[in-house]
Amino acid sequence: MKNNNWAKTILYVHKYLERITEGIDKLVEREAMNSYYFSSTRENDVTKVANKIIELTERKKRLINLKVLTENCLKDIDNLQARILIGKYINEEPCDVLAQRLNLAERTFFRRLGQAEESFSKALCRYGFSDEKMSSYLKGENWIFDVYENFMGEEKQLA
């Protein structure tokens, strides 16, 4: 990967994936119930309802796969690196608190953070998820692209 922005994005959104997939379940249930109760209206023809449910189910599968991919990549990298990434991106701990908890000097922490992000990016690539693949795989998830754009903006400000 050219930069680690997808790695940062995937790690950051991980904490929301389970809740969103549960929300998708509720949407599927609501679609099914609405089609049952309002089957006489034109808006709820069987094909339209089926396509909507299939679309939601595919979205749920994609998000579950993203969650599993994230967890597998974290297992594949060094334990300390995984703890750094989980603390920073998933638990959103302040860097100084995380460095202290891990018994690292701040300078060492930031050096290790960069190494951890790079290791995670390489793990994503080993699973076949380059920048281009990640962009196409998550094409319909605008909220994830918003997070990605925020990391891109931060990178441009630092340059």
Regions of interest found by a model, annotated:
Residues 91-108:
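Helix-turn-helix DNA-binding module
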Residues 20-24, 80-84, 98, 113:
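A general secondary-structure boundary signal
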Residues 64, 107-110:
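Polyanion-binding and phosphate-handling cores
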Residues 1-73, 121-159:
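N-terminal interaction/assembly modules
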Residues 76-93:
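Short amphipathic alpha helix immediately N-terminal
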Residues 109-127:
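DNA major-groove recognition helices of helix-turn-helix
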Residues 73-77, 108:
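Histidine kinase transmitter module recognition
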